[in-house]
């Protein structure tokens, strides 16, 4: 700490200056009136007592500054000691880890007493084992993974639940900044979806008060590009719950039983991290109708579907886990999957009407630089049969027309040319007739 920053030194300096000024005034003799005849200058006098006082004060300042410096050094040394202690502890733990032998992994089967448990080792045998004193007994429930000492088989620590890497990667889905305000033409569908998913998670007491059971899940079906996946993303971003994004095709595995195991792991992870939403896109990959004939691969898909049905039946009605499924082929789904009690609500996501297309045009061109008066009504009339993805593509194509003309904005003519171009491409697409489920 410098002398200017130290309030004590500053105070001492002010006191010294005041004393010196006072002594000077006290010692200054009365000046005689000067006359023209005689003027005599007296030599300045130095008070020995004042000189000793100033000397002692300066010495005290030096000692105080030295004390401050030593105090800062002491603090730095203590911080260094704490850092070295942390490094020492880490090194000790590393040495112990290198010198210690491995431990077995087991699963708690039953509690016999506070100190004795039946544990199933990973190799298969079951043992009655003790517990280390530092282990929390209240967490030793049935099915909990623990480590066992390789010699005494004592429970050493509790392990987290084993999660399949494939299931864990499903939880790292990027939700983005999608909101319901960015989805146009689906007001009624958004209301139905939020009633089934959001309302039971945020206000479950409403259903208890009325005396009804909230639905377990919802099926979104309709033509491609109408916003089914977008709705699920908006739900996840709005509620703030844990979200598992699982394309149904990614669940299918070539080894027998692996697909069903992934389904079990996924639902177990969801129950442990409630509130949680499971979104299965293109569910027709595993939810197709079952039939007696078929290859071994078809039978494996049917076993996966049966495991999915079993897990959905095991849900608590007022639990904090909800499921959303999406497909553009609802006619191929198995009736057992569609029955009430599993997917209680089916929401059709149709092609947008004129009002919906107008709203979608405004949403997708909101952030685009524009010049001139845009007549969206003309674009809406020309875009009959377009879905939301087609309208977004119109905004992109209009931007390309502006780039070709070396402009940094689009004009109404660019948008009309883009609509005509997308309409020409739409002729190549087939159509599927959808009926309400």
Curated annotation (Swiss-Prot):
Residues 1-51 are annotated as: Disordered. The modification N-acetylserine is found at residue 2. It comes from the Eukaryota. GO terms for cellular component: nucleus; proteasome complex; proteasome regulatory particle, base subcomplex. Keywords: Acetylation, ATP-binding, Nucleotide-binding, Proteasome. Residues 35-51 have a biased composition (Basic and acidic residues). One of its GO terms (molecular function) is ubiquitin protein ligase binding. The keyword Acetylation applies. N-acetylated by NAT1. GO terms for biological process: ERAD pathway; nucleotide-excision repair; positive regulation of RNA polymerase II transcription preinitiation complex assembly; positive regulation of transcription elongation by RNA polymerase II; proteasome regulatory particle assembly; proteasome-mediated ubiquitin-dependent protein catabolic process. Pfam families: AAA, AAA_lid_3, Prot_ATP_ID_OB_C. The 26S proteasome is involved in the ATP-dependent degradation of ubiquitinated proteins. The regulatory (or ATPase) complex confers ATP dependency and substrate specificity to the 26S complex. PANTHER family: 26S PROTEASOME REGULATORY SUBUNIT (PTHR23073). Belongs to the AAA ATPase family. This is 26S proteasome subunit RPT4. It comes from Saccharomyces cerevisiae (strain ATCC 204508 / S288c) (Baker's yeast). The lineage of its organism: Eukaryota, Fungi, Dikarya, Ascomycota, Saccharomycotina. The gene is RPT4.
């Amino acid at each position: 700490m410098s002398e200017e920053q130290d309030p004590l030194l500053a105070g001492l300096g002010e006191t010294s200056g005041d004393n010196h000024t006072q002594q000077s005034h006290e010692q200054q003799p009365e000046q005689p009136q000067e006359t023209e005849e005689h003027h005599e200058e007296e030599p300045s006098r130095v008070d020995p007592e004042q000189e000793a006082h100033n000397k002692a004060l300066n010495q005290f300042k030096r000692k105080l500054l030295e004390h401050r410096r030593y105090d800062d050094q002491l603090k730095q040394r203590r911080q260094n000691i704490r850092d070295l202690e942390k490094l020492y502890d880490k090194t000790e733990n590393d040495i112990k880890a290198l010198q210690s032998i491995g431990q077995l992994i087991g699963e708690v089967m039953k509690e016999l007493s506070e100190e004795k448990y039946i544990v199933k080792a990973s190799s298969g045998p079951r043992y009655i084992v003790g517990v280390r004193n530092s282990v929390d007994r209240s967490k030793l429930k049935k099915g909990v993974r623990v480590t066992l000492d390789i010699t005494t088989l004592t429970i050493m620590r509790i392990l987290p639940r084993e999660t399949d890497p494939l299931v864990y990667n499903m939880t790292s889905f990027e939700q983005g900044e999608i909101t319901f305000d960015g989805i146009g033409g689906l007001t009624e569908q958004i209301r139905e979806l939020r009633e089934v998913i959001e309302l039971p998670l945020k206000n479950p007491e409403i259903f208890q008060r009325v005396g009804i059971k909230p639905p377990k899940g919802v099926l979104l079906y309709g033509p491609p590009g109408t916003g089914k996946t977008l709705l699920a993303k908006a739900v996840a971003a709005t509620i703030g719950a844990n979200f598992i994004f699982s394309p149904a095709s990614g669940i299918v595995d070539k080894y027998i039983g692996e697909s069903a195991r992934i389904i079990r792991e996924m639902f177990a992870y969801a129950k442990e991290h409630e509130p949680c939403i499971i979104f299965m896109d293109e569910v027709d990959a595993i939810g197709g109708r079952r039939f007696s004939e078929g290859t071994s691969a078809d039978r494996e898909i049917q076993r996966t579907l049966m495991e999915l049905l079993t897990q959905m039946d095991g849900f608590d009605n007022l639990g904090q886990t909800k499921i959303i499924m999406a497909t553009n082929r609802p006619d191929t789904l198995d009736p057992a999957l569609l029955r009430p009690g599993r997917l209680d609500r089916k929401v059709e996501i149709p092609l947008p009407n004129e009002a919906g297309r107008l709203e979608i045009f405004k949403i997708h061109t909101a952030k685009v630089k524009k010049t001139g008066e845009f007549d969206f009504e003309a674009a809406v009339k020309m875009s009959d049969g377009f879905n939301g993805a087609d309208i977004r593509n119109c905004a992109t194509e209009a931007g390309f027309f502006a780039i070709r003309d070396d402009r940094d904005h689009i004009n109404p003519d660019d948008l009309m040319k883009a609509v005509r171009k997308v309409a020409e491409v739409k002729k190549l697409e087939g159509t599927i007739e959808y009926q309400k489920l």
